[in-house]
Structure formats: structure tokens, C-alpha cells
């Protein structure tokens, strides 16, 4: 049996795909120099009037991330107009951009765990070599 998806899930998936494409192509050419931005998630309201777009901004400081979110908010009419041309909907959701730090935070935690494991192994190796002497 086919898996059922709600309309909001299908719209969110389509908005995700199209906004990612817009950011990669049209927005990038308008803004110029910008860090790598990926769309990590999209939540669409039940009435399809609003879409929360969570973006991950790589290789940027916290301040640069805030500037990029502000810049995305300034260009949301431009992004929404292109989105309206690509989607076959009566009305396109209003876009709200948020910075998603979960991926970067996960990478940071993973690095900390790896460093801790490496320190423990080197300490264990030192202890083993001292016991053998």
C-alpha cells in the first residue's frame, strides 16, 4: 500500500526543493559573495499561508549568520515571486527564514567526542608503555 502524505508535507517538500534551487542559482547571482547556504527544513502551516524555512549557513560567524538571515528576509519578495512562477498553487506561502544551527552544532559535538576518544587512547597507550617498563 502506498504511503499517504498530507498536503502540507507535499507542499513543504516542493517549497524546500524550489527554494534551495533559487538560493543556489538566482539569489546567489543577485547577492554576490555569500557563504554556503543550504535549506535544511521547511515547515508549512496547515492553511498553507506561511512557510518557515530553516537554513544552515556554513563557514560563517554568528554575526555573519544573522546578517545572512536578515538579507534573506529582505529578498523574500524576490524569492517568493520566483517560487510563485514555479509552483502550481493558488497562493504561495509567505516565507520566514530562520538559521538552523543543529547541523553545525552536531558537527562540533562529534569533533569534541572524537578529540576526547583520541586523548583517552593516547593516555591509555602511555599508561601501557609505563607499565611495561
From Swiss-Prot:
Which GO terms fall under biological process for this protein?
Answer: maturation of SSU-rRNA
Question: InterPro entries attached here?
Answer: KH_dom-like_a/b (IPR015946), RbfA (IPR000238), RbfA_dom_sf (IPR023799), Ribosome-bd_factorA_CS (IPR020053)
GO molecular function: any one? ribosomal small subunit binding
Q: Name one GO cellular component term.
A: cytosol
Q: What is its main location?
A: cytoplasm
Domain of life where this protein originates: Bacteria
Q: Which UniProt keywords apply?
A: Cytoplasm, Ribosome biogenesis
The record's subcellular location field reads:
Cytoplasm
Q: Does the keyword Nucleotide-binding apply?
A: no
Among NCBIfam families, the record links this protein to: rbfA
| Function recorded in the entry | One of several proteins that assist in the late maturation steps of the functional core of the 30S ribosomal subunit. Associates with free 30S ribosomal subunits (but not with 30S subunits that are part of 70S ribosomes or polysomes). Required for efficient processing of 16S rRNA. May interact with the 5'-terminal helix region of 16S rRNA.
Family to which the UniProt record says this protein belongs: Belongs to the RbfA family.
The annotated subunit structure for this chain is: Monomer. Binds 30S ribosomal subunits, but not 50S ribosomal subunits or 70S ribosomes.
Protein name as annotated: Ribosome-binding factor A
Q: Which organism is it from?
A: Alteromonas mediterranea (strain DSM 17117 / CIP 110805 / LMG 28347 / Deep ecotype)
The organism that produces this protein has a lineage beginning with:
Bacteria, Pseudomonadati, Pseudomonadota, Gammaproteobacteria, Alteromonadales
The gene behind this protein is rbfA
Amino acid at each position: 500500500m502506498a504511503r499517504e502524505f498530507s498536503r502540507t508535507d507535499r507542499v513543504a517538500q516542493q517549497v524546500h526543493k524550489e527554494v534551495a534551487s533559487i538560493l543556489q542559482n538566482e539569489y546567489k547571482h543577485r547577492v554576490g559573495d555569500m557563504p554556503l547556504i543550504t535549506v535544511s527544513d521547511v515547515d508549512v502551516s496547515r492553511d498553507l499561508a506561511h512557510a518557515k524555512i530553516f537554513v544552515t549557513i556554513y563557514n560563517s560567524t554568528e554575526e555573519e549568520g544573522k546578517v545572512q538571515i536578515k538579507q534573506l528576509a529582505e529578498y523574500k519578495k524576490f524569492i517568493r515571486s520566483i517560487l510563485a512562477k514555479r509552483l502550481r498553487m493558488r497562493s504561495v506561502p509567505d516565507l520566514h527564514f530562520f538559521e538552523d544551527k543543529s547541523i553545525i552544532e552536531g558537527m562540533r559535538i562529534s569533533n569534541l567526542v572524537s578529540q576526547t576518544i583520541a586523548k583517552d587512547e593516547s593516555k591509555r597507550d602511555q599508561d601501557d608503555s609505563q607499565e611495561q617498563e
